[in-house]
Amino acid sequence: CEDCHNLEYDNWQGSHHDLAMDVANDTTVLGDFEDAEITVHGVTSRFYKKDGKFLVYTNGVGGEMGEFEITHTFGWYPLQQYLVPFPGGRLQTLPLAWDSKDNKWFRVPPDEPVEPDDWLYWTNAAQNWNGMCAQCHSTNLQKNYDIETDSYNTTWSDIDVGCESCHGPGSRHVEWAEMPEMGRPAVWNFDLVRKTSGLDSREHVELCAPCHSRRGAMGDDNHRPGDLLDIYLPSLLSEDLYFADGQILEEVYVYGSFTQSKMYRHDVRCSDCHEVHSIELVKEGNELCLQCHRGAQYDTTQHHFHKQEGEEGEPIVSADGEVLFKVGTGAECVQCHMPGRYYMGPDYRPDHSFRIPDPALDAEIGAPDACLRCHVDKDAQWSQESIV
């Protein structure tokens, strides 16, 4: 694709999609493998290299200590996970990951000890890459599970999230593009199987939803046109996943919260805020929201009741004096309207339901109070009295 689509390729290169998965080598591995150690729940694990291989000595099947080779990386920032091959074509996800934000090893939650016979233990089904993770980190992923032998022969076209993940199979498009320009037939969508432009907002959002949603899958994604529900079953707004007002509780991957929002109902789509190839925000700070919302009305102290960056004021500090939020943070739209939660340790995920803070309701139903996320020295009564 790069031969013709240079700009799109350059934007994609180095993105979270590009770095979704890779073969472990000196370029792709971020973690410290210079005899680094971490002790969790009385078990000391060691990361090291030998004969060019990345190895970890830790507790494995049945809790027995052993040496395991790491063959693949998974993700990049703010954390990187690592995959270990097991018999039956399985790749298993280590419970120890690299915090690429603070450069340290840590244990991926849950923080409490997990027994070797628990479904969540890292050598068991919950941490199996083939069945739980692979479909959204590689392109044209075919699990190829054999129920008779309880084994996998998993394949992919691209190890990461590549062009065909969104655009669909591209061979016919390449054949069309390689014809002399005057000899190209008039074909639908340049002979690409899946349409990515000229869509309505629902169709556009559902291009992203297969991976950016909490859902079950009824088969492998063939990256071809069709309704989201042809293959996927998005999770409902259940009490184990969302707070009673719809705020995110568990890791739900955006779609379920965004489709609750007024933004979604008014045809806002993912690409209004995210550049589709780099996945970066199209603008920084409040400028992102001011693409649609009038700055004279909303980017003002009269609206958000906070000091702007550069104005005199006192930052919010912790009990031991650490600065938690500098002056001006409260003037950012996302602080009040997209409060988030941390998942998998250091991974902060903003809530995409775009709510108006309601401290009284939050106190009544036990949902997070957007004000108290920053104002850690205050209480719910203060929040309710402060909302005008």
Model-derived regions: residue spans:
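Local sequence-structure signature of Cys/Sec-based thiol-disulfide redox active-site neighborhoods
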Residues: 2-6
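Primarily the internal scaffold of c-type cytochrome electron-transfer domains
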Residues: 7-75, 81-87, 93-95, 103, ...
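An exposed acidic His-Trp-rich patch
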Residues: 122-125
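Function-dense linear segments that define catalytic or interfacial modules
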Residues: 128-135
